[in-house]
C-alpha cells in the first residue's frame, strides 16, 4: 500500500527527497547529494499540469511522490464583515520544512487578533506527525483561525503515531477530509496552469472515485 512505500522514503534523514543516505560511501552517490541545490520552498499561483496529474493523483501506491504540494485559499474577514481572499500553492523541495510548516512561516507568519481567518488547504497527502504537531500549536494559540484540510492521499496511515496526530487535529477543531472528484476538479480550475487562449475540462482518471472511497473509509476508521 502507499503508506508502506512512503514510510520507507520517510525513514531516511532527508525524508522528502527520497535519497538513500545509507550509501554515502559511494563517491558517485555522495557527489549527487552534494550537487543538490539548497532547500527552498517553491511558491506560485498555478502549478504545471504534469505536476498536478502526478502529485495529486489519489493512488494507493504512491511511489515517487516524495514531495508535498499544498494549494491554499485564505479568507480574511474584518469585524465589519469585509473579506479579502488570496490563493496560491506551495511545493517543498529537497530536505527541510514541509509545505504545511512553510505555509505558516511564509504565507501566514502572523495573525491579527482583530481579524478572522478561514483557511482551506488542498494537499497532495495528509500531514506527517511533525507537521500535525505544528498545526496543533498554531491552532491552540490562534483562536481566530479556522482550518479545513482536504487531502488526496493518507500518508503512512497505518502508523500509530500518525493516527494519533490526525485524531488530535480533529479534537483541536481542524476539519480533515479526503478529496472527492469534485475537489480535484476545483484544483484543476483554480490552481493549475491552463493553455493560453483555452480552458481544458478536467478529465478524471479511471479509479478516482474508487480511491476516494478507499481513503475515506480509512480516515473514518482513524477518526472515529
From Swiss-Prot:
Entry annotated with the keyword Zinc: yes
Q: Which SUPFAM superfamilies match?
A: Cytidine deaminase-like
* A matching Pfam family: APOBEC2
**Chain spans, region Disordered:** 1-23
Q: Where is the CMP/dCMP-type deaminase domain?
A: 64-169
Which GO-annotated molecular functions does the record name?
A: cytidine deaminase activity; identical protein binding; metal ion binding
Identify which residues the record assigns to the active site: 100
**Gene Ontology BP terms:** cytidine to uridine editing; mRNA modification; mRNA processing; positive regulation of gene expression via chromosomal CpG island demethylation
| EC number(s) recorded for this UniProt protein | 3.5.4.36
Record's keyword terms, sorted: Hydrolase, Metal-binding, mRNA processing, Zinc
> What is the reported tissue distribution?
Expressed exclusively in heart and skeletal muscle.
Q: Which Gene3D superfamilies match?
A: Cytidine Deaminase, domain 2 (3.40.140.10)
Subunit relationships? Homotetramer.
User: Know the name of this protein?
Assistant: C->U-editing enzyme APOBEC-2
> Quick one: which gene encodes this?
Apobec2
Amino acid at each position: 500500500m502507499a503508506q508502506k512505500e512512503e514510510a520507507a522514503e520517510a525513514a531516511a534523514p532527508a525524508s522528502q527527497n527520497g535519497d538513500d543516505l545509507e550509501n554515502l560511501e559511494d563517491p558517485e552517490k555522495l557527489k549527487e547529494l552534494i550537487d543538490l541545490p539548497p532547500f527552498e520552498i517553491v511558491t506560485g499561483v498555478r502549478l504545471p499540469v504534469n505536476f498536478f496529474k502526478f502529485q495529486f493523483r489519489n493512488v494507493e501506491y504512491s511511489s515517487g511522490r516524495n514531495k508535498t504540494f499544498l494549494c491554499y485559499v485564505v479568507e480574511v474577514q474584518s469585524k465589519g464583515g469585509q473579506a479579502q481572499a488570496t490563493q496560491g500553492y506551495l511545493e517543498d523541495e529537497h530536505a527541510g520544512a514541509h509545505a504545511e510548516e512553510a505555509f505558516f512561516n511564509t504565507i501566514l507568519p502572523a495573525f491579527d487578533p482583530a481579524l478572522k481567518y478561514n483557511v482551506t488547504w488542498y494537499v497532495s497527502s495528509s500531514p506527517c506527525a511533525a507537521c500535525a504537531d505544528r498545526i496543533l500549536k498554531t491552532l491552540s494559540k490562534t483562536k481566530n483561525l479556522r482550518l479545513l484540510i482536504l487531502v488526496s492521499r493518507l500518508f503512512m496511515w497505518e502508523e500509530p503515531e500518525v493516527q494519533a496526530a490526525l485524531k488530535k487535529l480533529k479534537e483541536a477543531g481542524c476539519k480533515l477530509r479526503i478529496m472527492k472528484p469534485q475537489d480535484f476538479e476545483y484544483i484543476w480550475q483554480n490552481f493549475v496552469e491552463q493553455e493560453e487562449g483555452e480552458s481544458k475540462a478536467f478529465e478524471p482518471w479511471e479509479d478516482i472515485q474508487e480511491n476516494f472511497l478507499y481513503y475515506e473509509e480509512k480516515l473514518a476508521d482513524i477518526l472515529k
